[in-house]
Amino acid sequence: MMRIALFLLTNLAVMVVFGLVLSLTGIQSSSVQGLMIMALLFGFGGSFVSLLMSKWMALRSVGGEVIEQPRNERERWLVNTVATQACQAGIAMPQVAIYHAPDINAFATGARRDASLVAVSTGLLQNMSPDEAEAVIAHEISHIANGDMVTMTLIQGVVNTFVIFISRILAQLAAGFMGGNRDEGEESNGNPLIYFAVATVLELVFGILASIITMWFSRHREFHADAGSAKLVGREKMIAALQRLKTSYEPQEATSMMAFCINGKSKSLSELFMTHPPLDKRIEALRTGEYLK
């Protein structure tokens, strides 16, 4: 299943827009309780907007096409495989889509376990054996069965809430200190332009730091999805699929999609900001059975 970074762009846009609304409406003058309520509404708002739009955004991002009726043997195999594994995992049949990309990749998304989407790249269908492709699909089905999208939404909502709240409290203090005189006994928030500028910068900075939390969860859920695939189709098939990914093209999907894909980009400033664990760690975890217990 795909999931973090697609949220990040939408969350960022929603938070900036809501932040502007807060500034224009003077919400920074309200009580701490009022600000917390607004932060909760707006913080979770971005996450739930992302969740509800996730299938549409994902398909649009990669140019995916939902298979309404299989047109050839390859599409028929794909639909049948997804249907079989969905039944094994106890979820409703997801929509199935294909998108054109040379790299070996797949993702799953959707607002609910029973209203989900599984999409695979043409590169996966062309370059993986049936057993390897089956394991990748099982990995995505496991993401859906585990409810990773909803869990990610809740985590992102909490993170957004604290980012908004703390940023605006500090911005209010900074604006009051830098922006102006106030008469004794009269509440003042200083220069509103300073307030908005400081709040926006702090939201961006804290948002980047908070992404460490969401990225950790993204990596953690990959191990569990690998284990779920091993339970559905066998450990050796999943190991073989991951080994195949090591020799594949660097993923071409947009950065905002990486958390949803089975194959994440390997180049990163730090593992803290990676959506996926290194492939060698995932293979080792399967071999030791660490997440299969």
UniProtKB/Swiss-Prot annotation:
Active site feature: 140
UniProtKB keywords: Cell inner membrane, Cell membrane, Hydrolase, Membrane, Metal-binding, Metalloprotease, Protease, Transmembrane, Transmembrane helix, Zinc
Transmembrane segments: 4-24, 34-54, 158-178, 193-213
InterPro entries, per the entry: HtpX_protease, Pept_M48_protease_HtpX, Peptidase_M48
Keyword Transmembrane: yes
Amino-acid positions noted as binding Zn(2+) in the UniProt annotation, renumbered to this chain: 139, 143, 222
CC terms in the record's Gene Ontology section: plasma membrane
EC id: 3.4.24.-
Comment on bound cofactor: Binds 1 zinc ion per subunit.
Entry's localization field: Cell inner membrane
Gene Ontology molecular function terms on file: metalloendopeptidase activity; zinc ion binding
EC class (word): hydrolase
Membrane topology: Multi-pass membrane protein
S-S bridge residues: none
Cofactor(s) for this UniProt protein: Zn(2+)
Top-level taxonomic group: Bacteria
Gene Ontology annotations of biological process type: proteolysis
Cross-referenced NCBIfam families: PRK05457.1 (NF003965)
Family: Belongs to the peptidase M48B family.
UniProt protein name: Protease HtpX
Organism name: Escherichia coli O127:H6 (strain E2348/69 / EPEC)
